[in-house]
Amino acid sequence: MNRLFCIAMFAFCAGFLSAQDVSWPEIGLDAKPAARWWWMGSAVDKENLTRNLEAYAAAGMGTMEITPIYGVQGNDAKDIPFLSPRWMQMLQYTESEASRLGMQIDMNTGTGWPFGGPEVGIEDAACKLFVTEYRLEGGNTLDQRIEVADKKQKPYAKLERLMAFSDTGKCLDLTDKVKDGMLCWKAPKGSWRLIAAFCGKTLQKVKRAAPGGEGYVMNHFSARAVKNYLGRFERAFDGKFKDTAGGATAYPHNFFNDSYEVYGADWSEGLFDEFLARRGYKLEEHLPEFLAAGERSDKTRRIISDYRETLGELLQENFTRQWTEWAHRHGAKTRNQAHGSPGNLIDPYATVDIPECEGFGLSDFGIRGLRKDSLTRPNDSDLSMLKYASSGAHIAGKPYTSSETFTWLTEHFRTSLSQCKPDIDLMFVSGVNHTFFHGTTYSPAEAAWPGWKFYATVDMSPTNSIWRDAPAFFQYISRCQSFLQMGQPDNDFLVYLPVYDMWQEQDGRLLMFDIHKMARRAPGFIEAVHRINDAGYDMDYISDNFIRTATCRDKKIVTSGGTAYKALVVPGARLMPADVLARLLELAKEGATVVFLDRYPEDVPGYARLEQRRTDFKGTLEQVKKLGNKQGKGKTVFFGTDYVRTLAQTAAIPEAMKTSFDLSCIRRKNPEGYHYFISALTGKDTESWIPLAVPARSAMLYNPMNGVSGKARLRQKDGKTEVYLQLASGESAILKTFTEVDVQAPEWKYQTAARGAVELSGLWNLRFVESAPAVHSVPDSVALGSWTDLSFEGAKTTMGTGCYTTTFVIENPASAQDWLLSLGDVRESARVRINGRNVATLWAVPYCCSVGQYLCPGKNTLEIEVTNLPANRIADMDRRGVKWRIFKDINIAALGYKKGTYAGWEPVPSGLLGPVRIIPLKITKNEMQ
């Protein structure tokens, strides 16, 4: 009796667990899309804050990040100074309203960018090296003042070193011999070159600053300057301004820092001393090499590499780490864009709580049917660039990677939701799982259309026409991110970032790794990343510091963040610190796999103790090569120039969906097995059995566009698990595998077109449910095509939603197992109703949906509400001279930061272009085993 009861209970629980395992993950707050929320002039009020937040919440957004910027012309009286008591009251109200609506608030630790403002005195402002040189013959004294040549710097520049270099190679430090600007020194015999190094100021002001945020950019290399800067926030949040009413305001969920754009900041006070402490020799004794122009010697390149490494360490320790620790003390976390920094990007990304990458421009994958626009710019952030942030998160064990999403995909007012999908899919396969739109602007109800706007943005706001159907897009993001935030990363390889090669090879002194120049900074590394990806593998980058702390467990390399990898790959690095190579040797001896592609490292970076370090390096390299030459079982070091053949010798299995089917994907692991996000970022359709790199007993497919799921078809062939997959160009899917369990769930509907498709040609009824400016005299019946080609008033200028209606006859809907509605070319999104019932919102190619359950025998009524872009309306306003560019500072700039209007734009196609077809479907049987 008891035994039977236990068996029955086990069966019940197993069935229950299976039902739970196959469901969609719960969509948490962080899985919902977030957005940068610009406060223009911080001219906010409670009524409009509530209005804005309610619109965002209703559409499905989760987090709003407040970034105050410049204000609106003629609105100065309503501007609220940043961090003033009134500003803190508005923040407090915003946090309260967000909580009421189930949202959360992040905020920029400043206004505009980069960090700076009125509290940054000149002593804490960003610094720049200035050099003045003098010539002096032996026996003479200098009758010139030791001073900076740049007149603007005279009030600020401080002498750091005065060094004398003779023609015979002598070097003297004369700094202590300068009194009141005059050198008290008689030159010994010979010809002398005197170099005076001054710590001056960049005088850069905060870019796009808000009221109360204007001022100098701070010195990110100075611990004192950063501490002083953060002190202003503590006083504001603790309510310590003397006229603060209402007490302390809660710290935000996250503090944010935008990309590092501290231009020309190549120095800091005390840098000579920091350099000596960190690099082991005096930089000032090598100023002739450090300042040398033209062709550089190896010595010069090594010294400059050491200088670049020192700047990176100062930024990491004095800014990134201090800022993050400060936020933690106040119960907040940090979100940071490290790109643009002068250091090894992996380390600052890994230091913060949420590393953030940035897309800038539009990617073109050749997706079939996707609209093209001439007014775009190519995306500077490919997969290789986006992976810096996710790599930092993965190797450090951080759960989220965020993204500044959709920065300047197209010219303003011309970006469709369909154009957004490929680039967000690219971010997903690159490791992003917490997207932030760039962005949306607080806009009061009384602001005339288009409302308050920020340049360089997709404008994901309620005043944009794409907002009408954006909730469907937001649902897509939330569904994807619910999976992408689940489990842990499962990338195959760690790939060594050869930053010392970059530091040594690149010209100039200050080297900033911004996204727009990475193709020039690291062409070899970028090529290697794409070759590894094309070979079917996925990877995270690793820095020297993280290699130093990596361990070997069960023949896998485990980072300090707890993430395991099957091998560490060194792609063509010429320079490597001796201790890092030694650590790779130790890992290999412990059973971990290390792969050298193209070449073994050849030398150590840096200048100090060069020969001793070279000796250590060469001894270690000989041992590494000895392991690489070993044959047979137990080999742990591999070398090769053929990426595919060499990587195939590791324990990692390539994903055939990448190598054979041109699909993009990312794989994560979970307690039941693995899950993939897969996107057809290609012009080809896919319908095939696809081998997986992981074993599975069963699997589920999930469609993030509509929430449909079902049990996938699997088979075992040639020792591999294969899944049957159907993906059209531009489509995406989520696949979840179960290693041990055969889950019980309805089967995924694999469908193919049957004969008997019907094209709904002829005339359609057209009426506008929304239009601005309002349209008049719309024809009762129209052929499919752009409504801008029609002759009614406002056809070429309106922004709105046109409802297309037609009827069609299907005598026996049951004659097919399902029916597919294909809308063809849609400009730009569509809501579908059949027989008065809502069917779907279609916002991306292919514009298709299943409609079988909505059909009835005989006559059926089809309604399609199509919403266009605001481009035609804004162009008309420019032609009529309507003043809507009412913002201070840069106001509204066109692509490339150019001034101009949209008056010359041709009408952008709008409406339902078709062809529209009803296609009978048959569900294929599982006969392909």
Where are these regions (language model features)?
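Bacterial Sec-dependent N-terminal signal peptides
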Residues: M1-D21
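Carbohydrate-binding surfaces of carbohydrate-active enzymes
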Residues: A34, D45, L49-T50, T63, ...
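An acidic-aromatic loop/edge-strand motif
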Residues: G112-I122, K128-L129, Y134-R161, F165-K170, ...
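Short beta-strand segments within Ig-like beta-sandwich modules, predominantly Fibronectin type-III
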Residues: L714-Q716, V839-W843
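Aromatic-lined ligand-binding clefts that engage carbohydrates, nucleic acids, or primary amines
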Residues: P691, F808-N835, W843, L862-V866
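Extended acidic/polar, glycine-enriched regions
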Residues: K154-P155, R161-D238, Q716-Q751, R755-G756, ...
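Mature N-terminal segment immediately following signal peptide/propeptide cleavage
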Residues: Q20-T63
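Acidic/aromatic-lined carbohydrate-recognition and catalytic surfaces
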Residues: I69-K177, W185-A187, S191-L194, F198, ...
